[in-house]
């Protein structure tokens, strides 16, 4: 059964990775870059501090817990235990895959930390903000970042699915902590007040604009 699933994963990887061109090389290289999304992160931080200083600090601490949880489960626990080679280091297919800028990543790829971290971030703040539009756009963003890892040839689809599962787990665990302690007397019930819809729309707009700029810039590279 495991061998059958692995063979399907390999075939799907080769198929999906085969759809490439120079334009999308630039697009997905930037989408996969962690620094690319700094405008989104700064916007979310600004929204938090516009509402309530105590809640902002509380949520920033929890965001640290969120990313630490997602990243450590994926990179610190699962990868060293499973030892599944990335497609870029798998002898059967490494020479036929498409890569960008010679990047092949480390030896092991299950599960994808990119997928885990972006899904954790999107999931957690979707729960915190409670805004349908932001939820849809942020989840699509997380899926786009996740797909970029397949395009770049450094993760199997199975690595991505595993990362998505870790990200969802981290998001719900962190949100549970957020709700559990939000009524603590030191927080003065600050977490019970909903976020402004206009502020959340700004975050959604920044995310869309950030993504759009990537596609535009890539056309001139």
Regions found by a protein language model. Give the residues of each.
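Transmembrane helix interruption/hinge and helix-loop junction motifs
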Residues: 34-35, 51-54, 129-133
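Hydrophobic alpha-helical transmembrane segments
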Residues: 31-48, 61, 114-117, 136-137
């Amino acid at each position: 059964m495991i061998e059958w699933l692995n063979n399907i994963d390999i075939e799907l990887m080769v198929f999906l990775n085969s759809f490439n061109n120079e334009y999308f090389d630039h697009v997905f290289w930037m989408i996969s870059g962690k620094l690319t999304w700094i405008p989104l992160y700064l916007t979310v931080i600004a929204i938090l501090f516009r509402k309530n200083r105590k809640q902002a600090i509380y949520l920033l601490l929890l965001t640290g817990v969120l990313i630490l949880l997602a990243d450590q489960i994926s990179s610190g626990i699962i990868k060293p235990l499973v030892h599944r080679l990335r497609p870029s280091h798998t002898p059967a297919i490494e020479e036929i895959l498409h890569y960008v800028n010679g990047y092949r990543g480390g030896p092991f790829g299950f599960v994808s930390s990119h997928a885990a971290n972006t899904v954790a971030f999107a999931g957690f703040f979707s729960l915190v903000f409670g805004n349908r539009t932001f939820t849809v756009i942020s989840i699509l963003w997380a899926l786009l970042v996740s797909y970029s890892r397949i395009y770049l040839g450094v993760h199997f689809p199975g690595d991505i699915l595993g990362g998505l599962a870790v990200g969802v787990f981290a998001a719900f665990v962190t949100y549970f902590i957020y709700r559990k302690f939000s009524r603590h007397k030191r927080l003065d019930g600050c977490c019970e007040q909903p976020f402004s819809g206009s502020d959340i729309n700004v975050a959604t707009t920044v995310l869309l604009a950030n993504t759009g700029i990537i596609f535009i810039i890539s056309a001139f590279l």
